[in-house]
Regions:
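A short, structure-level motif marking secondary-structure boundaries and short turns
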Residues: 15, 34, 56-58, 87, ...
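Conserved beta-strand hairpin/beta-sheet module of binuclear metal-dependent hydrolase folds
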Residues: 25-79, 83, 170-192
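N-terminal pre-domain segments of enzymes
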Residues: 1-29
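Active-site HxH/HxHxD metal-binding segment of metal-dependent hydrolases
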Residues: 39, 67-70, 77-147
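Short catalytic-loop micro-motif centered on adjacent basic/acidic residues
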Residues: 41, 59-62, 88-91, 158-160
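Metallo-beta-lactamase
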Residues: 14, 19-20, 29, 34-36, 58, 65-67, 148-151, 155-222, ...
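Binuclear metal-dependent hydrolase catalytic cores
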Residues: 2-13, 106-112, 116-120, 128, ...
Length: 222
């Protein structure tokens, strides 16, 4: 996988804007909205987060940054939900913009947190790969890629899609709407940042992640 100059410049702009969201989080605010019945977008302009209203309670996918957590909580309230009733937080991968607010949310709600096993070493001996200061949080469990998580009216099938990170996880979400069933897909991390050979070598990660990324795109499309 070759990353040309134009792509690299675009990636640098994306990362600059993301880092600016830590300094000025209010600039990332956007209105929450319903994706389909019982599935809502509650993230911001740069980092996604999804709220699922299930028979088993509120499920949240990705925590966003600690600095933007107040925007996340405000978005949940705007939709008429109580953020303290979040039961489970599913984290797609171990970067600060997806798990930075995990500790805050866990302390605020008492929720369980699920985290990809392939990124578990980010939380221990390779905290530099988190790409920032992420407060410690308690991991309840890892994903079983051979089964789905059943929440009654909504079922989530985690799919291992390595590349962006070794443990990057995507979610296939099956939603019951009356007698109909909808299938939604959320890719856990399509960013090319970190995937150049120079960056992989610098981060002491295997070059095979490039091929893993290509394979993961095919896997999620099945």
């Amino acid at each position: 996988m070759q990353i040309n100059k134009e792509s690299r410049e675009l990636l640098e702009k994306v990362m600059t804007r993301l880092h600016n969201s830590i300094k000025n989080p209010w600039e990332t605010q956007m209105e929450p909205y319903q994706v389909v019945p019982n599935v809502f977008y509650v993230g911001n302009k740069y980092v996604g987060s999804y709220l699922l209203k299930t028979d088993a309670g509120i499920i949240l996918i990705d925590a966003t940054l600690q600095e933007t957590a107040y925007l996340l909580i405000e978005s949940i309230r705007k939709l008429g939900f109580d953020p303290q009733k979040i039961k489970k937080l599913l984290i797609s991968h171990g970067h600060i913009d997806h798990c930075g607010a995990a500790r805050l949310i866990q302390e605020y709600t008492g929720c369980e947190i699920y985290f990809p096993q392939g990124d578990a070493f980010f939380l221990t001996d390779r905290r530099d790969l988190l790409l920032g200061d992420v407060p410690d949080f308690k991991v309840t469990g890892n994903y079983d890629y051979n089964s789905q998580m059943d929440f009654g009216n909504i079922r989530i099938k985690p799919v291992h899609t390595p590349g962006h990170t070794p443990g990057c996880t995507s979610f296939l979400i099956s939603v019951d709407i009356g007698i109909e069933k909808l299938l939604l897909g959320m890719h856990g991390g399509m960013g090319l940042n970190g995937l150049s050979l120079a960056e992989l070598e610098q981060n002491h990660l295997p070059a095979s992640l490039q091929k893993d990324y290509e394979k993961s795109l095919k896997e999620i499309s099945k």
